[in-house]
């Protein structure tokens, strides 16, 4: 058992474990991703670099300040490593890892990180990456499995413990508090302890406290345990997303959008279990069986991650800890698992950075340095570069506004959807004698399951539309259109949703569009910003999203009236405001290389 745990948490990789994957550097171009795909290499690109740079210099505008100048190409998906054979030399690699910012003194860590990126790009997508896609998808799955799971228990908690419909919404506040804490702590912990530990433990913590909540004797204990469960599930998206991105070749970057398809699947599974258990058991048993079941499902996902899959530690993390030999071994391991070849060695890494313009800062980054660096992401000195020019400042402000608005607007409706469905969704139904004032529990949970099914294709469509060449689509267009339609159907739900059938139609369309919205938003945001400011920009966006999400249940619990319509109107207004912000964003990242 001790040896097994050591292999999962503390195993040190070695290139000697992966014999047969290394090829000489001079043969690397035969094994590149572009060569295997039959794409033409750039011929004589080295001689054209000067002209390309001159063209860029002559057409420089504010977008150049953002770091988003790109070479024109008929094929928008061409990768950064489509080099000719001459560029697979030490000198060629030196030029390639230093391009983009002339005159800059690169650190040893930065150059080696870029070289590892190139090696992973040459290996391309393979068995290991697709397995990781599924296992990281478990994180997205668990996130919505539990967010919707808590929402689905609210009517039962209210009835069993004698809590009013408004008061029981504080249960969601407990969950969001845990999500906020977990998101911050696990994101930071992954930089200090490594991705592998955080990747495995988040689902374990979620399953333990989630299952314990099924045995809670009273409502305060339920809230407390849901909050602890949230500290685990809150780490899934930041940890799993970062891990997947660090193993993802640039040419397959659209898979980051496709990863979001697991999110509505989590909602679907949660709604199906709730429909079965809550409608077929007494009120004090149904929700408990439901919570225990999704707790077991989460534990099974942990077992698959921890027991059946050997996860490589992130090579970027290993490099930051001064463990260069292990970082190289991980790249060899990826090539071995994908049945591909690689040219990366420690000697190549050292030779590429061995120039006078390299800043010889220590490669190893201490835990204290990581902590200081993460905390500095929220300092004014680190945020100030995000407003260094008008276009970048406007982009930053708008994307943060969108994240904050959606962070509050989404839970105001979705976190309490089972409640809205259970009593007609609007005051109109209660006033009109011809319309039913409420739906049966069976109708409520059946409709919720149908709504969940309707949302799944949204993420699949998002992955296609983000790269569509239409001027009205792409990242920005798809995001704005889906957000606008979501807001419209929220308004229609509260004004015309006087019957369960009407509610079902409006909410199904709304769920479909919101899954497109979230799928694009998670991929679009990190693409907007250049690498030097990407961490600060996305970190603040995530923080604002969680904080406003924490406020949403407090508003819903204390808003005047019966709480059936005002929260939905407010949700629609916030989503509509986010749409306005998206339209004003001055950047489209479709077909552009990540900087």
Question: Predicted regions span which residues?
Answer:
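Helix-breaking motifs and short loop linkers at transmembrane-helix boundaries and internal kinks
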Residues: 146, 162, 194, 215-221, ...
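C-terminal transmembrane bundle
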Residues: 173-176, 188, 211, 226, ...
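Cytosolic juxtamembrane N-terminal segment immediately preceding the first transmembrane helix
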Residues: 1-150, 159
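Extracellular/periplasmic helix-loop-helix junction of adjacent transmembrane segments
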Residues: 151-181
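Glycine-rich segments within core transmembrane alpha-helices of 12-TM secondary carriers
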Residues: 252-301, 542-552, 560-561
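Central mid-sequence intracellular linker of multi-pass
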Residues: 259, 280-366, 571-595
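Conserved MFS/SLC helix-loop-helix module at the cytosolic interface between two early adjacent transmembrane helices
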Residues: 181-220
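Flexible cytoplasmic loops linking transmembrane helices in multi-pass membrane transporters
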Residues: 100-130, 336-415, 428-442
């Amino acid at each position: 058992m001790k040896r097994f745990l050591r292999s999962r948490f503390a195993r040190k990789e070695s290139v000697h474990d992966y014999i047969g994957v290394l090829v000489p550097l001079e043969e690397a171009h035969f094994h590149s991703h572009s060569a295997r795909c039959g794409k033409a290499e750039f011929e004589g690109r080295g001689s054209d670099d000067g002209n390309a740079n001159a063209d860029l210099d002559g057409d420089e505008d504010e977008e150049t300040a953002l770091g988003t100048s790109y070479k024109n190409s008929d094929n928008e998906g061409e990768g950064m490593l489509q080099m000719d054979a001459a560029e697979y030399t030490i000198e060629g690699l030196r030029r390639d890892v230093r391009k983009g910012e002339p005159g800059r003194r690169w650190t040893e860590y930065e150059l080696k990180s870029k070289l590892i990126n190139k090696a992973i790009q040459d290996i391309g997508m393979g068995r290991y990456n697709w397995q990781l896609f599924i296992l990281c998808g478990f994180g997205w799955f668990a996130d919505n499995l539990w967010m919707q799971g808590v929402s689905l228990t609210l009517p039962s908690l209210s009835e069993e413990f004698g809590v009013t419909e408004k008061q029981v919404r504080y249960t969601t506040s407990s969950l969001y508090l845990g999500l906020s804490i977990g998101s911050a702590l696990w994101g930071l912990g992954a930089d200090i302890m490594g991705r592998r530990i955080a990747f495995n433990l988040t689902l374990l913590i979620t399953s333990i406290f989630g299952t314990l909540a099924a045995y809670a004797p009273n409502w305060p204990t339920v809230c407390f345990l849901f909050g602890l469960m949230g500290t685990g599930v809150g780490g899934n998206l930041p940890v799993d997303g970062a891990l997947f991105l660090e193993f993802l070749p640039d040419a397959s970057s659209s898979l980051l959008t496709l990863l979001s398809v697991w999110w509505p699947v989590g909602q679907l599974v949660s709604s199906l279990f709730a429909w079965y258990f809550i409608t077929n058991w007494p009120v004090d048993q149904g929700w408990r069986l439901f919570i225990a079941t999704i707790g077991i499902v989460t534990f099974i996902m942990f077992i698959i991650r921890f027991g059946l899959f050997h996860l490589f530690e992130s090579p970027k993390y290993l490099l930051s800890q001064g463990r260069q030999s292990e970082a190289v071994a991980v790249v060899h391991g990826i090539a071995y698992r994908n049945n591909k070849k690689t040219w990366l060695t420690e000697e190549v890494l050292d030779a590429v950075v061995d120039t006078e313009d390299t800043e010889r800062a220590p490669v190893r980054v201490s835990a204290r340095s990581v902590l200081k660096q993460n905390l500095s992401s929220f300092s004014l000195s680190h945020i100030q570069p995000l407003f260094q020019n008008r276009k970048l400042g406007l982009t930053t402000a708008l994307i943060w506004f969108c994240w904050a608005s959606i962070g509050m607007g989404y839970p105001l409706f979705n976190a309490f959807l089972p409640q809205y469905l259970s009593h007609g969704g609007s005051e109109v139904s209660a006033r009109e004698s011809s319309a039913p004032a409420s739906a049966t529990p069976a109708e409520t949970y059946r409709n919720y399951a149908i709504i969940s099914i309707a949302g799944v294709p949204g993420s699949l469509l998002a992955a296609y539309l983000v790269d569509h060449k239409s001027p009205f689509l792409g990242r920005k267009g798809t995001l704005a259109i889906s957000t606008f339609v979501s807001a419209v159907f929220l308004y229609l739900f509260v004004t015309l949703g006087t019957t369960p059938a009407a509610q079902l139609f409006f909410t199904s369309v709304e769920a479909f569009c919101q899954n497109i919205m979230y799928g694009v938003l998670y991929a679009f945001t990190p693409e907007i910003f250049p690498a030097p400011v990407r961490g600060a920009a996305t970190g603040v966006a995530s923080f604002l999203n969680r904080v406003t999400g924490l406020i949403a249940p407090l508003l819903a619990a204390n808003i005047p009236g019966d709480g059936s319509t005002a929260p939905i109107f407010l949700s629609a207004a916030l989503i509509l405001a986010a749409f306005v912000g998206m339209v004003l964003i001055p950047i489209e990242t479709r077909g552009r290389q990540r900087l």
